[in-house]
Amino acid sequence: MYYNYYLKYYSQSGFFLENNGAIMYNYMYMKTYYIRTYGCQMNLHESEKLAGLLENAGYTLATEPESADIILFVTCCIRENAEQKVYGHIGALKQYKAENPDVVIAVGGCMTQQKSAAEKLKQKFPFVDVIFGTHNLCDFMRLLEEKSGRKKTLIEITEDDCESENTPMTRSSFPNAWVNVIYGCNNFCTYCIVPYVRGRERSRTIPDVVAEVKQLVGSGYKEITLLGQNVNSYGNDLKDGGDFADLLDAIGREVKGKYRLRFMSSHPKDLTERLVAAMARNENVCHLIHLPLQSGSNDVLKRMNRRYTREDYMAKIDLIKKFMPDCAVSTDVMVGFPGESEQDFRDTLDIMEKADFASAFMFVYSRRGGTPADKMPDQIPEEVSKARIMEMVAAQNARTAEHSAAYKGRTIEILCEDFDEKRGMYLGRDEYGRMGYFKSDKDERGNFVNVKVTDTNGISLYCEKI
């Protein structure tokens, strides 16, 4: 999955950023940039920071790469497919770069942080100008300056995280905003490359996060999503204490107004009663939690180093429903992990049915070099994994459709995010993350709108404005 920077993330529809001009500095003409972002919300948020750095230096947003002075790729390496997309899009620029040698092509993000990845990228695409890692975001403008006049690719990959909290930012997802609360991951699941490219966990302080959320709500943002590879680990590294439940309480206590608060992602082993209780008592926190399952087989979970059992996971589901009976739970699930038997797969389908997920991101295991799982025996044949994922998707899609159908006739509140030109309807999400479409005679973007659900289709709700 990738996102052109000018696209609105939640709706993934063509929403061009408004641009009110930029400081000219000493440039003879208005220089432009284009960012293509792959992967998760964390990457999208880092693209907002890179855009802020560029606009602070006088650049303006281009709507196509061919009209930009700087073309920037923010990459993902969570699965092989993500890397292949990056290679394809960079390769497509070879002729354009040859015809426009002054155009700067820069590649950063998780893919480049992998061991030997930068050199591989340089050899494969020698026309790329700058390659930088996940910890070099703060240095991007310096790297551009150092590259000026150099013919060879400039590579800078460091292991020490830069603190990018105060980086200038151009947000692209109004009325939604992303706020990092914790960086990195300490879990080392055997299939996952993230700890190797994102580093160890580092939490921002509660006052720092609260101040950013307060500023965003004061500026008119209506939905704030707190981000981290594992938000449930928030505060473990802070000397003065405070965990994620304390953070939710602090935001609820100090940030007033009508807004929604979401967060992602949560590791099941770290989901506590304290946190679930904090969700329940803070009225701005949405009753939606993304709780990655990955597998419903205890044997597979052990080989994944997930550090919980299927019984532990279902206990977390029961805990959530105890405090918030209406809470929607979404998840991540993979098939085809090394050694996954037919019974392991059936165990996963069983727990998906019992947990009754509102929605799920389902995918086939992807080998990642440098992870323990890559060296495990009994890699699953592609045809077996494909058959399993098709069966899983069909079962979950039917379940998701049932969840949607239960909405019919209900009145819900939607935060309007965009206008769908093809449908001729406004769109937005309710508290539980369900997408709703409706018509209105006025521009509703950024507004909370009460609607009645008249029909459903899969995950979508079709509504009438009240």
Annotate each PLM feature.
Residues 2-10, 15-26:
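Short, positively charged and aromatic/hydrophobic N-terminal segments
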Residues 25-234, 274, 311-322, 346, ...:
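Proteins enriched for Cys/Gly/acidic motifs involved in redox and nucleic-acid/cofactor modification
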Residues 36, 227-229, 264-266, 292-294, ...:
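Generic beta-strand/beta-sheet core signal
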Residues 40, 235-254, 304-307, 367-398:
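Radical SAM enzyme [4Fe-4S]-AdoMet core and its adjacent flexible, acidic
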Residues 104-107, 114-116, 218-342, 353:
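Conserved SAM/AdoMet-binding glycine-rich loop
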Residues 172-175, 185-187, 285, 295, ...:
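Short flexible coil/turn linkers enriched for glycine and charged/polar residues
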Residues 189, 209, 226, 263, ...:
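Conserved, mostly hydrophobic/aromatic
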Residues 375-466:
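Terminal RNA-binding accessory module
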